[in-house]
Amino acid sequence: MARKKISVIGAGNVGATVAQFLAAKQLGDVYLFDVVDGIPEGKALDIQEGAPHWRYDLDVVGFSTSDETKYKNMEGSDVIVVTAGLARKPGMSRDDLFDKNVEIISDVSRNIKKYSPDSIIVVVSNPADIMAYALQKFTGIDPSKIMGLGGSLDSSRFRTFLAKELNVSVEDVNAFVIGGHGDDMVPFIRYSSVAGIPIENLLSKEKIDEIVKRTRFGGGEIVNYLKTGSAFYAPGISITAMVESVIMDKKRVIPCAAYITGKHADHYGIRDKFIGVPIKIGEKGVEQIYDIDFKPDELELWKKSVASVEASSKKVDEWIAKHAH
């Protein structure tokens, strides 16, 4: 059986951590790309040299894209993970990264389109829902093959905080977060439970509100501690879960930024944009989008999230119009 091929573009903390987790889970050969000379080669070699202890017989190889022809090495990738971009610094919101990152995504997109347009693509560069939209616009790739990190990580944080508060195994906590991957995310209390028991039966409203707030600013909390960068271990494993569901055709249901169109657009009140919703992930990418019903207070939060995504997506359209040759 031919081994799968996974390309990771961006060998910073997130990209390198993803590369290590993908290898550790033996999901396929990992090709790591970065514009900084030596970084992808060095990190890939370091991951490769741990193979005897991790017990993976896979190739982990790095390529510096300061020579753009090196992108040719991602040809025929089953999955491409795009983490290239600037990391957040204290005081920055995910949206502050917009201008720099859309430029980086434009370069990456050109090379994906040229060398590996049939891959399933996971977009991580912040703001991920907006960068997924930009990548789709730049490449023209079928949007069902593109998904953005967001809810997968936010839900993981939400589940962690709930499990710690209740002193139960994280495995028994089911919870999810939808909407934009930003301060407008919508943690869904009603659909959150411990072994099927609604969390509203287990925690006071005040305590739940506190956990929701911490989830919403979970990324910022880590940025404030680290000072020079943002989270990478939890994002790394959240991305790995998405890739694993594609490679193994697991059909996992995970909230991610997906392209909303057709009847889903009527339901969610947003059309032809990427926003975080529960999706089924399999070998074809986004295989199903689930429509969930909102109560009035949830709908209010959702609409706020939609407005924020619409405004940022419009900035992408303006950027493209300005830079069209």
Curated annotation (Swiss-Prot):
GO molecular function, one term: L-malate dehydrogenase (NAD+) activity
Protein transport listed as a keyword: no
Keywords: NAD, Oxidoreductase, Tricarboxylic acid cycle
InterPro entries per the UniProt record, alphabetical: L-lactate/malate_DH, Lactate/malate_DH_C, Lactate/malate_DH_N, Lactate_DH/Glyco_Ohase_4_C, Malate_DH_type3, NAD(P)-bd_dom_sf
Domain of life: Archaea
GO biological process, one term: tricarboxylic acid cycle
Stretch forming the signal peptide: none
Chain sites annotated for binding substrate: R88, R94, N126, R157
Keyword Nuclease: no
Summary of the function given for this chain in its UniProt record: Catalyzes the reversible oxidation of malate to oxaloacetate.
Family: Belongs to the LDH/MDH superfamily.
Protein name: Malate dehydrogenase
Gene (name only): mdh
